[in-house]
């Protein structure tokens, strides 16, 4: 009788890379739709521009490296990076910033390390942080949510201002940022931090128009709920595991709740941290990147909790309004150490 020797893996499932990436992209849709409803068509344009740039940049790089271009592009990893980057950027960020961030994410943060599976840092967050450090003013220039906007923008208006810097009627981004009260608009996290440092109390800050309907800011709670729905969908499908999102959110909520209980006149309420900024996007779509996150169950819990702690620290004491991107990248640095000390012991051997 002939014995056939086979190599691993001995079991297979349908979780191919191409399909996983596609499901993650589809899970972003609820949050993206909420963004479009409250902040206009800008993020859709950014996603489209980033996607085209990512595919071109990855195709050129693969060609120079003598890799199979069509086969590699078909894994949808470049497309997912572009989508995550596009929905993270301000809706009306200039086109050249989107192109710059995407090229940096694909070529420097991904392909320079060897491509998918080799990069130690999340490419989308690398691209985002490059822009945040280089162009902080543009990266914190968000439109007021739809109920507070003085000028309604069509798809064509958004497209024109992204590529020219002004609407067809001549309105600049600075003019569009003013809400119905004539006050320059920022994100809820940025507004809360800036107002708190200027001496205002949390009670006074929450009287501002953007907090009229929600402690997390008009529109932002629905954007986060949209990404939460998408994240729960990924959990039910088994595309991601629960360890990182749960430990991330619990860590963030614990820090926010404890500080608020101790000094409610100096710290933001927990709901502002939970349902504002990029909290749910970071918890379910960015921190769970299988390439750059920890690979053990205990390690994932530590990794997620570390990100939650860093997000709270940066939001509370840092110079930037939101800390998800920096927190994820800093946690990426610790992954080898976390995996080393949390790897399961092989039977019959010491760790």
Swiss-Prot record:
InterPro entries: NqrB/RnfD (IPR004338), RnfD_bac (IPR011303). Its cofactor is FMN. The chain crosses the membrane at residues 20-40, 44-64, 89-109, 123-143, 215-235, 244-264, 267-287, 301-321, 322-342. It is found in: Cell inner membrane. This is Ion-translocating oxidoreductase complex subunit D. Keywords: Cell inner membrane, Cell membrane, Electron transport, Flavoprotein, FMN, Membrane, Phosphoprotein, Translocase, Transmembrane, Transmembrane helix, Transport. The keyword Flavoprotein applies. The complex is composed of six subunits: RnfA, RnfB, RnfC, RnfD, RnfE and RnfG. Coiled coil: none annotated. Part of a membrane-bound complex that couples electron transfer with translocation of ions across the membrane. Its main location: membrane. NCBIfam families: PRK00816.1, rnfD. It is a multi-pass membrane protein. PANTHER family: ELECTRON TRANSPORT COMPLEX PROTEIN RNFD, ION-TRANSLOCATING OXIDOREDUCTASE COMPLEX SUBUNIT D. GO terms for biological process: electron transport chain; transmembrane transport. GO terms for cellular component: plasma membrane. Its EC number is 7.-.-.-. It comes from the Bacteria. It comes from Pectobacterium atrosepticum (strain SCRI 1043 / ATCC BAA-672) (Erwinia carotovora subsp. atroseptica). The modification FMN phosphoryl threonine is found at residue 187.
């Amino acid at each position: 009788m002939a014995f056939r020797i086979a190599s691993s893996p001995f079991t297979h499932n349908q979780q191919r890379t191409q399909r996983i990436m596609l499901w993650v992209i589809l899970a972003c849709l609820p949050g993206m739709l909420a963004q479009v409803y409250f902040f206009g068509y800008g993020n859709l344009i950014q996603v489209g521009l980033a996607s085209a740039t990512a595919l071109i940049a990855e195709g050129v790089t693969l060609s120079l490296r003598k890799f199979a271009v069509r086969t590699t592009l078909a894994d949808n990893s470049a497309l997912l990076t572009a989508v995550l980057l596009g929905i993270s950027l301000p809706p009306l960020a200039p086109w050249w910033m989107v192109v710059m961030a995407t090229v940096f994410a694909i070529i420097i943060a991904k392909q320079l390390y060897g491509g998918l599976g080799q990069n130690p840092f999340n490419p989308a967050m690398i691209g985002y942080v490059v822009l945040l450090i280089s162009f902080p003013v543009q990266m914190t220039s968000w439109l007021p949510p739809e109920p507070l906007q003085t000028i309604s923008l069509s798809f064509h208006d958004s497209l024109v201002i992204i590529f020219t810097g002004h609407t067809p009627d001549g309105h600049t981004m600075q003019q569009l940022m003013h809400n119905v009260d004539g006050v320059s608009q920022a994100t809820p996290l940025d507004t809360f931090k800036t107002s708190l440092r200027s001496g205002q109390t949390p009670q006074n800050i929450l009287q501002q128009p953007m907090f009229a309907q929600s402690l997390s800011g008009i529109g932002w709670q629905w954007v986060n709920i949209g990404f939460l729905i998408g994240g729960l969908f990924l959990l039910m499908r088994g595309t991601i595991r629960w360890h990182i999102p749960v430990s991330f959110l619990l860590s963030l909520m614990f820090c926010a709740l404890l500080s608020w209980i101790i000094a409610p006149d100096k710290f933001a309420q927990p709901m502002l941290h939970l349902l504002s900024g990029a909290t749910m996007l970071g918890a379910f779509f960015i921190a769970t990147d299988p390439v750059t996150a920890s690979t053990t169950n205990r390690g994932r819990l530590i990794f997620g909790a570390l990100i939650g702690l860093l997000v709270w620290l940066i939001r509370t004491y840092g110079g930037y309004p939101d800390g998800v991107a920096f927190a994820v990248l800093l946690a990426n640095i610790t992954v080898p150490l976390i995996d080393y000390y949390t790897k399961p012991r092989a039977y019959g051997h010491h760790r």
